[in-house]
A protein has these predicted regions:
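Serine-hydrolase catalytic machinery in alpha/beta-hydrolase-like enzymes
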Residues: 1-75
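Nucleotide-sugar donor-binding loop of glycosyltransferases
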Residues: 31, 86, 130
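Primarily recognizes the serine-hydrolase "nucleophile elbow" in alpha/beta-hydrolase
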Residues: 65-120
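Short beta-strand/loop motif that positions the catalytic acidic residue
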Residues: 125-128
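Conserved alpha/beta-hydrolase "acid-adjacent" motif
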Residues: 133-139
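Catalytic histidine neighborhood in serine/cysteine hydrolases
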Residues: 145-163
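Catalytic active-site module of serine/aspartate enzymes centered on a nucleophile-bearing elbow/loop
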Residues: 167-169
Length: 169
């Protein structure tokens, strides 16, 4: 894990932002981890050790939404989709838990730690790589997926890292 120490970390998801922009989406990309930030905790109870990072991420997302609503009031803010990969996916699920009224859909790309809220709104999706399992209780059961209209999509042959800078459309 090199986290934010990679000097190209701000380009990691350029393929995804380009793809979504070409499909007509207005894309806002947030670089959460800065070069002088401490690395994420790699041991302990992640729901405790990583929570400060996730909470800061949620605050960053909330601030960004509030500011862009002022800058771009003409956008359809009722159709807001939040997407995050890995740690960003954990932030996405925490944001969906805390501010469900602000987003229409939340999509995680192989997050592993933050429990997906069991709710019908916002609509929740998670794309799962083939190489790592999520922690126990993070993902909804098949019954919960049906009950809450959640979707877990397993991607055969796609690894956790393939969803980042090595990913393709």
């Amino acid at each position: 894990y090199d986290g934010n120490k990679n000097n190209k970390s701000n380009q990691t998801y350029a393929y995804l932002t380009r793809f979504l922009s070409q499909k007509g989406f207005y894309v806002i990309s947030i670089q959460h981890e800065l070069a002088d930030d401490p690395l994420l905790a790699m041991e302990g109870n992640f729901m405790e050790t990583r929570m400060p990072n996730w909470e800061r991420g949620v605050a960053n997302i909330l601030f960004t939404i509030q500011e862009f609503k002022k800058l771009k009031p003409q956008l359809n803010w009722n159709d807001f989709i939040l997407i995050g990969h890995s740690n960003g996916g954990d932030m996405t699920m925490l944001f969906a838990t805390r501010y469900p009224q602000l987003i229409n859909k939340a999509i995680s790309m192989d997050h592993r730690r933050m429990i997906m809220p069991r709710t019908r709104n916002p609509r929740l999706y998670t794309l799962r790589g083939c190489d790592y399992d999520a922690d126990s209780g993070v993902l909804p059961t098949e019954k919960e997926q049906e009950q809450f209209r959640m979707k877990v999509v397993k991607l055969d042959g796609i690894t956790h890292s393939n969803m980042g800078e090595n990913g393709t459309e």
